[in-house]
Amino acid sequence: MSDNVIDKLYSIILDRMKTMKEGSYTVELIKRGKHYVAQKVGEESTEAIIASLVESQQRFVEEVSDLIYHLLVLMALENVTPQDVYKELERRMKK
């Protein structure tokens, strides 16, 4: 695992999935299931768009952070790693 924050956060999410730590927001999302998490990704995406259009840059950063977090939870539920995404992005950059 690398030292970047995305990989670290993904590792924490996987740990929460494994331990089902009581009181964890990640665990609450996991318990609600993939459909709920996917809905949260949609909500956070909309909030990020709105923030980019009418709110401060800081608010936009906060909403993008929420979006990335929820995407990582959904990725974990789908058994997709950040490395899978990195590889796909690298493949696309070569085009």
From Swiss-Prot:
It is found in: Cytoplasm. Its main location: cytoplasm. Keywords: Amino-acid biosynthesis, ATP-binding, Cytoplasm, Histidine biosynthesis, Hydrolase, Nucleotide-binding. Pathway: Amino-acid biosynthesis; L-histidine biosynthesis; L-histidine from 5-phospho-alpha-D-ribose 1-diphosphate: step 2/9. Gene3D superfamilies: MazG-like (1.10.287.1080). One of its GO terms (biological process) is L-histidine biosynthetic process. HAMAP family: HisE. Pfam families: PRA-PH (PF01503). InterPro entries: HisE, PRib-ATP_PPHydrolase-like. Transmembrane segments: none annotated. The keyword Lipid biosynthesis does not apply. Its EC number is 3.6.1.31. It comes from Sulfolobus acidocaldarius (strain ATCC 33909 / DSM 639 / JCM 8929 / NBRC 15157 / NCIMB 11770). The lineage of its organism: Archaea, Thermoproteota, Thermoprotei, Sulfolobales, Sulfolobaceae. It is an enzyme of class 3 (hydrolase). This is Phosphoribosyl-ATP pyrophosphatase. Belongs to the PRA-PH family. The gene is hisE. The keyword Cytoplasm applies. GO terms for cellular component: cytoplasm. It catalyses: 1-(5-phospho-beta-D-ribosyl)-ATP + H2O = 1-(5-phospho-beta-D-ribosyl)-5'-AMP + diphosphate + H(+). One of its GO terms (molecular function) is phosphoribosyl-ATP diphosphatase activity.
